[in-house]
Amino acid sequence: MIPVTATLIRHRLRHLRHRIRFKSTSVSPFHLPLNHPTYLIWSANTSLGKTLVSTGIAASFLLQQPSSSATKLLYLKPIQTGFPSDSDSRFVFSKLDSLSLRRQIPISISNSVLHSSLPAAKSLGLNVEVSESGMCSLNFRDEKTVTGAPELLCKTLYAWEAAISPHLAAERENATVEDSVVLQMIEKCLKEEMECGVKSEKSDLLCLVETAGGVASPGPSGTLQCDLYRPFRLPGILVGDGRLGGISGTIAAYESLKLRGYDIAAVVFEDHGLVNEVPLTSYLRNKVPVLVLPPVPKDPSDDLIEWFVESDGVFKALKETMVLANLERLERLNGMAKLAGEVFWWPFTQHKLVHQETVTVIDSRCGENFSIYKASDNSSLSQQFDACASWWTQGPDPTFQAELAREMGYTAARFGHVMFPENVYEPALKCAELLLDGVGKGWASRVYFSDNGSTAIEIALKMAFRKFCVDHNFCEATEEEKHIVVKVIALRGSYHGDTLGAMEAQAPSPYTGFLQQPWYTGRGLFLDPPTVFLSNGSWNISLPESFSEIAPEYGTFTSRDEIFDKSRDASTLARIYSAYLSKHLQEHSGVRQSAHVGALIIEPVIHGAGGMHMVDPLFQRVLVNECRNRKIPVIFDEVFTGFWRLGVETTTELLGCKPDIACFAKLLTGGMVPLAVTLATDAVFDSFSGDSKLKALLHGHSYSAHAMGCATAAKAIQWFKDPETNHNITSQGKTLRELWDEELVQQISSHSAVQRVVVIGTLFALELKADASNSGYASLYAKSLLIMLREDGIFTRPLGNVIYLMCGPCTSPEICRRLLTKLYKRLGEFNRT
């Protein structure tokens, strides 16, 4: 048993090395024209005929009458093992040469090998230099040129000598290639040919990228190829298996690709006389064409030319399917912006200010990046970093996104949807256990599930008010005594959601005005909080007017850590805060007009929608203590700030105090699906206990604790805090490492265009200097900067004159550094305008 165990450990360590290398390699944003069809050629397993299919498609495309000099096919083989004795690009090259002679249609053909391992290069008899990665750049090219003829370009990008899986070949031949390098080389080759094709309106170009082995075969880094090529999300052709057992293998391969978000235009396989196409067509419900090729001759001496001639009708049908699918895709993408403006009612959007050309068409997402379609840019796809974290919800990198997709698929297949009251099922139970052992550890004992952050707040308010009434004996009062007014104490600038109760619990703002909410009255005591920010390289405190006389004494901090230092509790400022809060709470103690402060609700540390302001944590901590001394239940609204958004799993670790009730959503599920929870103490739960159902908490949603959301949340909670999966977790396991480059942060905070900076955890925000007319939520002052950042591949959406960049808990600091570098450069241009 010992040798087996050691082998397994070595395998796991090697796998982790591969995975770490993939995750730490940040892929530069790509830019791919879509005006010519480009397809990935997949197969359900190795040796099923991918290269035969590529050759047949090439012949059908190039060897047609009448031929055209503007017709070109690019065949890329990114990863080739067994080279040079085995070369798929050479096979396509030689067969097209023979087929062109057979059909008497001249074509220009070339075959190039760009890089190989040293053993592979030596097998070619080449004397080459070896790079640090162990790969050699080759000047290997074979070509036959015919002027004015269609053109075939075959390119092998990376080759190894051993006829084994690429990850083993790379390891054994000491010649590694990072995933990002493979993708960048594919992009470069595709763009070179496509941009040449754009110059001629009559050009006709088809690009094939043939994978190695099966759908889930590893690439040279160990990353599965279905994950390796996912950033491009090119449509695919799946070469299935016509043999006994091939139905299962083909379906498994198809499902693996669909689960990762690939589109498959057709399935094609060799006929083995088992009629596999019938059950496959039935399974695919005619959504995807299933094409059958004649049996391939088994005689090694057969040059297959007659087989290609016999298969011509199938390959023509396949080619036409590919061309049509690409046209339909482009037609849909080109029409989406216009149609969206006609049928959508976007939230937080003045439609009169949105022009069709400014609508962002999102084709897909991979990790932190959108794939954006631009019809005006040669019908191209380009990547943009989602600096809004899709409105503050997103956390996954590409690896975690695929993991969550699998978890969601499994749970949907197992449970569909089941109702929650008086029921238990594994995803909900596991999620609740993880919540109580994580963000609720040390204080919470109950988990109440709901749909989104705002509904979680509604539930929290009901919980808090009931607890307050029980503690102050209002529940047993006479009918006359029950005519009391229960309000909240909250901070100006906080935002707790769009539902009616949540809006009542926040101070007047653009979100609560008469045009937005005619019922709004503002049922609370709303206080102006002290805020902290970075400016000119120093952390400063901004005190409300009521504290203005002490501003000079408490103006700056040496570091952000000092702001959160618990030793500040013994400071003079803490005593001033306490006296100020005690005075206001006493004035609204309920003596007058039967009004009572029945709950405290705060966004801990950061006011998000209110402008990304950092509230002095000392002030919030003192406020919590003052309310607790008066038996006023405390609600933490961690919908935005929870689950590592601010660098810790829960802001209780930053504030140094705990609530009675807390709300979580957004990053709870990694941002993949809506789900919210309201956590509460035993004492809060007990305030709803009684013999009558009328004393229970009568609030719920049809999708409360939906299995898919709970399973996704459980996976996200575990993933974010595990150092093996999230390499940003520090050795203590309680905080994220610093993601934003300190020197760049300091430089930006000192920029003449910048009023203030807030940086913590996954959040970087700045307020642009602007006069009163250009400040606030309705301001369009940042529009030109927004446009420049999107040109740089950064998708951001401002809060008036506040610009923010938001990454995920797993985002590489190198990516964050690149974002800040681009922002700093654009700030200079913005300032000049």
From Swiss-Prot:
Q: Which reaction does it catalyse?
A: (7R,8S)-7,8-diammoniononanoate + CO2 + ATP = (4R,5S)-dethiobiotin + ADP + phosphate + 3 H(+); (8S)-8-amino-7-oxononanoate + S-adenosyl-L-methionine = S-adenosyl-4-methylsulfanyl-2-oxobutanoate + (7R,8S)-7,8-diammoniononanoate
The protein's Enzyme Commission number: 6.3.3.3, 2.6.1.62
A Pfam family this chain is assigned to: Aminotran_3
Q: What biological process terms from GO does the record include?
A: biotin biosynthetic process
- Give me the residues that bind Mg(2+), please: T51, D88, E210
Q: What is its main location?
A: mitochondrion
Transit peptide residues are 1-23
Ligand binding ((8S)-8-amino-7-oxononanoate): W391, W392, Y495, K666, G700, R797
Is Repressor included in the keywords of this UniProt record?
no
Cofactor(s) demanded: Mg(2+); pyridoxal 5'-phosphate
List site positions: Participates in the substrate recognition with KAPA and in a stacking interaction with the adenine ring of SAM.
F348
Per UniProt, the keywords (alphabetical) are:
Aminotransferase, ATP-binding, Biotin biosynthesis, Ligase, Magnesium, Metal-binding, Mitochondrion, Multifunctional enzyme, Nucleotide-binding, Pyridoxal phosphate, S-adenosyl-L-methionine, Transferase, Transit peptide
GO CC annotation terms, alphabetical: mitochondrial matrix; mitochondrion
Q: In which pathway does it act?
A: Cofactor biosynthesis; biotin biosynthesis; biotin from 7,8-diaminononanoate: step 1/2; Cofactor biosynthesis; biotin biosynthesis; 7,8-diaminononanoate from 8-amino-7-oxononanoate (SAM route): step 1/1
Q: Which InterPro entries match?
A: Aminotrans_3, Aminotrans_3_PPA_site, DTB_synth_BioD, P-loop_NTPase, PyrdxlP-dep_Trfase, PyrdxlP-dep_Trfase_major, PyrdxlP-dep_Trfase_small
Phenotypic effect of disruption: Arrested embryos at the transition to cotyledon stages of development. Biotin depletion leading to lethality; this phenotype is rescued by exogenous supply of biotin.
Output this protein's name.
Bifunctional dethiobiotin synthetase/7,8-diamino-pelargonic acid aminotransferase, mitochondrial
Biological source species: Arabidopsis thaliana (Mouse-ear cress)
